């Protein structure tokens, strides 16, 4: 415990908050180009083939980013928009591809939660 005299001399140190999404550099989204599109398997106890893209951003960071939704049209050299948000069962994947922005198509035949997958309103 610090004495009052020590606190007068030094003061308390502020804790520095560490970002979970450093590659965004305090932006809401960043644009990038896919360098590799592949599937990978999640950690135990889950089992699937998760779709992931390796993306080279405009600020020269290279990050892994998850492609949500059923089916996608991404390949190497596709331009994508990424946002923050990690995937808990894929280590090292801390970003999501924004569906329906840049070269990424929205999920077709999507009826609920459409805004999260870039799907237009169906013609009833």
Swiss-Prot record:
Basic residues biased stretches: 111-124
BP term (GO), one: translation
Modified residues (3-methylthioaspartic acid): 89
Gene3D superfamilies linked: Nucleic acid-binding proteins
GO molecular function, one term: rRNA binding
Region of interest: Disordered: 1-29, 101-124
Signal peptide: none
Sequence similarity: Belongs to the universal ribosomal protein uS12 family.
Protein purpose: With S4 and S5 plays an important role in translational accuracy. Interacts with and stabilizes bases of the 16S rRNA that are involved in tRNA selection in the A site and with the mRNA backbone. Located at the interface of the 30S and 50S subunits, it traverses the body of the 30S subunit contacting proteins on the other side and probably holding the rRNA structure together. The combined cluster of proteins S8, S12 and S17 appears to hold together the shoulder and platform of the 30S subunit.
Quaternary structure and interacting proteins, as annotated: Part of the 30S ribosomal subunit. Contacts proteins S8 and S17. May interact with IF1 in the 30S initiation complex.
The name this protein goes by in its record: Small ribosomal subunit protein uS12
This protein's encoding gene: rpsL
